[in-house]
Amino acid sequence: MIFISIIGLLLSNAVTLRQDMSVNFNRIALIDLIYCILHDTMSLSIINKGIGLHGGLLHITNITLIFHIFIFFLSILILQLTSFYPRKAWIPEHSSLKDIIYQKFLNYRTKIFNKMGEHMKIIEYPLILLFVISGAVFLMSTNDLVSIFLSIELQSYGLYLLSTIYRNSELSTAGGLIYFLLGGLSSCFILLGTSLLYINSGTTSLDGLYILNSISDVKDGAADMPALTSWYKSYYLNFALLVFSIGFLFKVSAAPFHFWSPDVYDAIPTIVTTFVAIIAKISIFIFLLELVYHTNNYLSEFSWTYLLLISSLFSLIIGTVVGLTQFRIKRLLAYSTISHVGFILLALSGCSIESTQAFIFYLIQYSISNLNVFIIIITIGFSLYGYITTNKEYKDLLDKNNSPIQVISQLKGYFYINPLLSLSLAITIFSFVGIPPLVGFFAKQMVLSAALDNGYIFLTLIAILTSVIGAVYYLNIIKKIFFYLPDHSINPSIGEFLFKKGLIFEAGDFKGRITLISSPFSITISIITLVILLFIFMNKEWLSMGTILVQVLFSN
């Protein structure tokens, strides 16, 4: 169905240049993704332990199907940011036709209603998103080295295009170029690892690699079997997998391969950052889960998964320490992501039932929480279009149309402008910190408990310390929002215009109720925030799903 929509959007883009049709194209993509969710949900009951497709190039399991649905769901939430207008006008009851016309004219004159940035005018946007989603879905289900590279490149090239699709933005173009060049470097590592795997195994099938790895693993524990120990060395595949995994760690911005992500996140528009920071990582982590499960060497002295532990250590330290010095909000979120990637890698490297369950749960909850933060930041930017600021530093910011909120100090005193939105952001940030009873606390508890069970005592201590230190830059955001007076004030020209036209009773009465956040934005933020806040009352459903997925994986 995704391919049918891609073909339809390609044909539509070829015959029309109307930029106002972009919203309709986005809604078509939304309908397509909803259909994909329904189709995959119906397929869950017949998959059982897995189905091979196209001669073994793809392998569909219940875990991959669940995360297909999860990616489709998150993509719908991201795509609705450009499928519905972010603001709606408030018009007094019993208004005359004349007053309504004046109100509409006011909204367009002050650019409150139609100041959407370029993201509402690019008709190629949903098309590229569907290409990225296709690559992510294929990557999670791939079972061959060739299809792995094709899938990761399909996903990556779509993200490069998304990063540079805002042609009038110099920052966006520069960020997309950095992403493209360094993403190409990571692809070189993947290709090098692929060639080493093929040279050492003679096959491109992952099933063949898993069999060879099992044989070499048994050989390392079979000192009394010289016939088995003479023909193959386990470090052949382990070294190849080590090089192979470096490329994927680069793409998920795990330290020490993280240096591209803060610059790229900060440069590209916030809506694109939402997609790059979330969807691109989920597919790679699920692929790495399958790879770690089938190639972890229990009897060998050296395993490529040691790289995951080293990367986890660096990610926890660098993401926390360097994040303390950040004052730009998207750079701060980039380092926050690096720190959370450290927790995910710590759970991934354990390869036990408990650690895999912690990995799945942490990945799901962090993706949802991270999405909520980005949606709230985008919504705050939309809500401040009717305000002006006295701070001259904000006037020097570049690309304010596509990234209205760029520095943390822009959130100063926002609680006095929109208390409910501020509380939603605070709850999500407290979940990042790991404060009980929010969902982030239970996720970190599961990861640390699984790490202790696997004997990673030092890494567990580092994770606890970095969580405490990382709370400093999270609480700095809370302090700016709640404990400072706002720098923003109502645009006086709006109040004067309203007063002259008789739309309100006194000048300066323009408030947030005049331009409300649209219903899709409000509903999305409200539901995600309630899930984060009330997880303690519905934890059985989440944990049961993770347990079932782990049992399916370990029963294969």
From Swiss-Prot:
The reply to whether DNA damage figures as a keyword in the UniProt entry is no
**Which Gene Ontology molecular function entries are recorded, alphabetically?**
NADH dehydrogenase (ubiquinone) activity
Catalytic activity annotation: a ubiquinone + NADH + 5 H(+)(in) = a ubiquinol + NAD(+) + 4 H(+)(out)
* Class of the enzyme per the UniProt entry, highest EC level: translocase
Q: What is this protein called?
A: NADH-ubiquinone oxidoreductase chain 2
Q: What does this protein do?
A: Core subunit of the mitochondrial membrane respiratory chain NADH dehydrogenase (Complex I) that is believed to belong to the minimal assembly required for catalysis. Complex I functions in the transfer of electrons from NADH to the respiratory chain. The immediate electron acceptor for the enzyme is believed to be ubiquinone.
**What is its membrane topology?**
Multi-pass membrane protein
Transmembrane regions: 58-78, 122-142, 145-165, 177-197, 239-259, 268-288, 304-324, 333-353, 358-378, 423-443, 455-475, 517-537
Keywords for the protein's UniProt record, in alphabetical order = Electron transport, Membrane, Mitochondrion, Mitochondrion inner membrane, NAD, Respiratory chain, Translocase, Transmembrane, Transmembrane helix, Transport, Ubiquinone
Q: What is its main location?
A: mitochondrion
Q: Where in the cell is it found?
A: Mitochondrion inner membrane
A Pfam family the protein falls into: Proton_antipo_M
Task: State which gene encodes it.
Answer: ND2
* One cellular-component annotation, GO: mitochondrial inner membrane
Q: Name the source organism.
A: Podospora anserina (strain S / ATCC MYA-4624 / DSM 980 / FGSC 10383)
